[in-house]
C-alpha cells in the first residue's frame, strides 16, 4: 500500500486565496488574489525586475504597480492572471508539483457553466493534475460547522451569497446572490473618508483603507442610536497611523461603512440588506424546512468578521420571522477560513475518494465531465 498523497485544497476568493493540504485544520498559505504589473519601465538594468508580481509581493511593491484582481464578484474574469495565481500557489506558496496531487478548487454558487469547464481544463491541461474536483463555497462552510442542514450567509471580498442547504444539498431555486461585499465596503469607506478630507484614490491607497476597515469598523446594533451617540461624544473615535506616519481620526465612519450590508441603498444598490436577502431565501424554501433554516443561520467569509454583526443579524431576522420562531445565528470564530476548512474535511473523507474526476476520465470526456461529477 503506497502512502496516501494529500490533496491540495485551494479556495480562490475574490480578495484572498487560501491554500493548503487536505486534512490540515487551517490553510498554509493565505495571500491576496492580486496580480500586479509595473506602471513604469525599469531603468536599472540587472535589478531582476519581473513583468508581473503575485500576492504579497505585488502587495508590498504596490506603490509602483497597477494591481488587478482576476476574480470579480466571485467569478473568474481574467484567466491569464488566474493561471498566474494558481502557478504561484503551487510552486511558490505550497511548493508542490501539481501533477502529483489531486486538486480541490472552490467556486461561487451559480457559477457560469463555462467557468467550471475552463477551470477543469486549466487544472488538467496546464498543471497536469492527476485528479480534480470543484465544490461550492457555501456548502463547504456548512460542512466546516459540522452541519448538513442550514442556511449559509457567505460574504467575502467580491460577492455575498445566501445558500439554503438541506441534508447536504444546496437548494438552487432559493440561492440569492448580492454583488455587494468587502470590496464595496472598502470603496464606500474611501468615499466617506474623503468627505472628512482624507483622500485615498489609487489602487495602492485602497489597500490602506481596507486595513482601516478591518481594524476599526464594527456593526451597530441600532444605527440611528449609534449616529446620535457619535454626534454627541467622541468616545467612538479612533485614530489610525498611515504608512507615512500621519495620524487620522475616524468616528462614525467606523459603523457607517458596514451598515451598507444592511442598507445597500447607501451604495446606490437596489437589493435588500443581508437580513432581507436571508429572509427571502428562507421564504423560497419549502415550509417544512424553514424551521431548520431559521435555527441554523451560519455566517462565513471575511466580511462577516465585523464585531456586532451576529447580534444585529439576530435582531433583524427575529423582527422578520414569525413571532414564535427560534432564530439562531452561528458565527464560528474561524469563519474567515471556513470554506477552506470545509474543503479540507471533504477532500480527506474516505467516502469522497471515488468522487474525484480522474485525468483519465477527463481525457475521455473533456471539460464537460465537471457538470456530471461535481454538483
Swiss-Prot record:
Gene Ontology MF: a single term: ATP binding
Reactions the enzyme catalyzes: ATP + H2O = ADP + phosphate + H(+)
Keyword Hydrolase: yes
SMART domains reported in the protein's UniProt record: ACTIN
A Pfam family that the UniProt record links to this protein: Actin
Main location: cytoplasm
InterPro entries: Actin, Actin/actin-like_CS, Actin_CS, ATPase_NBD
GO cellular component: cytoplasm; cytoskeleton
Assigned protein family: Belongs to the actin family.
Function: Actins are highly conserved proteins that are involved in various types of cell motility and are ubiquitously expressed in all eukaryotic cells.
CDD domains tied to this protein: ASKHA_NBD_actin (cd10224)
Catalytic class of the enzyme: hydrolase
Record keywords, A-Z: ATP-binding, Cytoplasm, Cytoskeleton, Hydrolase, Nucleotide-binding
Disulfide bridge map: none
Subcellular location: Cytoplasm, Cytoskeleton
EC number(s) on file: 3.6.4.-
Species annotation: Exophiala dermatitidis (Black yeast-like fungus)
Protein name: Actin
Amino acid at each position: 500500500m503506497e502512502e496516501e498523497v494529500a490533496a491540495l485544497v485551494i479556495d480562490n476568493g475574490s480578495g484572498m486565496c487560501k491554500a493548503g493540504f487536505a486534512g490540515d485544520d487551517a490553510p498554509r498559505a493565505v495571500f491576496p488574489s492580486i496580480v500586479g504589473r509595473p506602471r513604469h519601465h525599469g531603468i536599472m538594468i540587472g535589478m531582476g525586475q519581473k513583468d508581473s508580481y503575485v500576492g504579497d509581493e505585488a502587495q508590498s511593491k504596490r506603490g509602483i504597480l497597477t494591481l488587478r484582481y482576476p476574480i470579480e464578484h466571485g467569478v473568474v474574469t481574467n484567466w491569464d492572471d488566474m493561471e498566474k495565481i494558481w502557478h504561484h500557489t503551487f510552486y511558490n506558496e505550497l511548493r508542490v508539483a501539481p501533477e502529483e496531487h489531486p486538486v480541490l478548487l472552490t467556486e461561487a454558487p451559480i457559477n457560469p457553466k463555462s467557468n467550471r469547464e475552463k477551470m477543469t481544463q486549466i487544472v488538467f491541461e496546464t498543471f497536469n493534475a492527476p485528479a480534480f474536483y470543484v465544490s461550492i463555497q457555501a456548502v463547504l462552510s456548512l460542512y466546516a460547522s459540522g452541519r448538513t442542514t442550514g442556511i449559509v450567509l457567505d460574504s467575502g471580498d467580491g460577492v455575498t451569497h445566501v445558500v439554503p442547504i438541506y441534508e447536504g444539498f444546496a437548494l438552487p431555486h432559493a440561492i440569492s446572490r448580492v454583488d455587494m461585499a468587502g470590496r464595496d465596503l472598502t470603496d464606500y469607506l474611501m468615499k466617506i473618508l474623503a468627505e472628512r478630507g482624507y483622500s485615498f484614490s489609487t489602487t495602492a491607497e485602497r489597500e490602506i483603507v481596507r486595513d482601516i476597515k478591518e481594524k476599526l469598523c464594527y456593526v451597530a446594533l441600532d444605527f440611528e442610536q449609534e449616529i446620535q451617540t457619535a454626534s454627541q461624544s467622541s468616545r467612538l473615535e479612533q485614530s489610525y497611523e498611515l504608512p507615512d506616519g500621519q495620524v487620522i481620526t475616524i468616528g462614525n465612519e467606523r459603523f457607517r461603512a458596514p451598515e451598507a450590508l444592511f442598507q445597500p441603498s447607501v451604495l446606490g444598490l437596489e437589493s435588500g440588506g443581508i437580513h432581507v436577502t436571508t429572509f427571502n431565501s428562507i421564504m423560497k424554501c419549502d415550509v417544512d424546512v424553514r424551521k431548520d433554516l431559521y435555527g441554523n443561520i451560519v455566517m462565513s467569509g471575511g466580511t462577516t468578521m465585523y464585531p456586532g454583526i451576529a447580534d444585529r443579524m439576530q435582531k433583524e431576522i427575529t423582527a422578520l420571522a414569525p413571532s414564535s420562531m427560534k432564530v439562531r445565528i452561528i458565527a464560528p470564530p474561524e469563519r474567515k477560513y471556513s470554506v477552506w476548512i470545509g474543503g479540507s474535511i471533504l477532500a480527506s473523507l474516505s467516502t469522497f475518494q471515488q468522487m474525484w474526476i480522474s485525468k483519465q476520465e477527463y481525457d475521455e470526456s473533456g471539460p464537460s465531465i465537471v457538470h456530471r461529477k461535481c454538483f
